[in-house]
Amino acid sequence: MEGTWIEVRVITKSEALEPISGIFYGLDCKGVAIEDPNDILGREQGPLTWDFADINILEHKGKVAVVKGYFSEEDNIDDVIAYVKERVEELKESGLDVGEGTVEAEKMFEEDWANNWKKYYKPIKIGEKIVIKPIWEEYEPTGEEMVVELDPGMAFGTGDHETTRMCVQALDKYVKADTTVFDIGTGSGILALVASKLGAKHVLGVDLDPVAVDSAKENISFNNVDNIEVLYGNLLDVVDGKADIVVANIIAEIICILVDDVKKALNKDGIFITSGIIHERRQMVIDKLEQEGFEVMEVNKDGEWNCIVAKLK
């Protein structure tokens, strides 16, 4: 998207997001965005996250969600608004609670559209020490807090996903001063940065996505650390040497494929921290780890997700 665009938005409730999104998808719009406070407020939060949440989100908890469609200036916006209003009214008449159901329009520039999501990404404290802070926010650490500066861009890993949180908590438990850590599927570099901040001697991040590699390298530069290396390549194929800890926040099927390579990449008694595992795939991963000579030490759960910590026997 370039230049000036028209944002048409419907003020609604969380339960009406899907059908109202469908209205926009049925039009020739250039993009659809959804803002749902329940995505932020619906999970258990620590006090720091609550303190840094936008006041608008807190005020509208459970009441307001927004669906936005983006249109070219050449589009007949009056017709678009009339059509959206008509369809929202039909949903209301069908018995769906659409909340306010108001339709608004606003001219926006590409930069506004591209950065609008940032207002929902705030500092998050994970455990006792780690604070994940977006680079555009201010935060003053206290006590032993360690701040990871992050601009996730298009790469996965912001700290607010259950799988990332559990991996951070596991790293906090197992990383020691002389530890070497491999981060497989590094994404934004968040786990590599956490390992570095916790005192790891050397950290290596690997990802198949060149966008993720660039994102991780940029985030490393924000944090002024010099013990992290990021490589583009086929996971462990590009890794030399061995690690004391391998962390992989991916999906269960890929984890099972990687277990043999992880085994080769770990020192004796090395730790494998892995997440991205839904409940239905948990036992599959445990079985594979045990078949390959790992001892499962922990199975942690958060929402629909699991994090498994295993030691190479």
Curated annotation (Swiss-Prot):
Pfam families, per the entry: PrmA
InterPro entries according to UniProt: Ribosomal_L11_MeTrfase_PrmA (IPR050078), Ribosomal_PrmA_MeTrfase (IPR004498), SAM-dependent_MTases_sf (IPR029063)
Any one GO MF annotation of this record: protein-lysine N-methyltransferase activity
Biological process per Gene Ontology, one example term: methylation
Enzyme class, first EC level, given as a word: transferase
GO cellular component: cytoplasm
Domain of life: Bacteria
Catalytic activity: L-lysyl-[protein] + 3 S-adenosyl-L-methionine = N(6),N(6),N(6)-trimethyl-L-lysyl-[protein] + 3 S-adenosyl-L-homocysteine + 3 H(+)
UniProt-listed Enzyme Commission number(s): 2.1.1.-
Residues annotated for S-adenosyl-L-methionine binding in this entry: T164, G185, D207, N249
Signal peptide (from-to): none
Keywords from the UniProt entry: Cytoplasm, Methyltransferase, S-adenosyl-L-methionine, Transferase
Subcellular compartments: Cytoplasm
HAMAP family per record: Methyltr_PrmA
Free-text function comment from the UniProt entry: Methylates ribosomal protein L11.
The family this protein is said to belong to: Belongs to the methyltransferase superfamily. PrmA family.
Name of this chain's protein: Ribosomal protein L11 methyltransferase
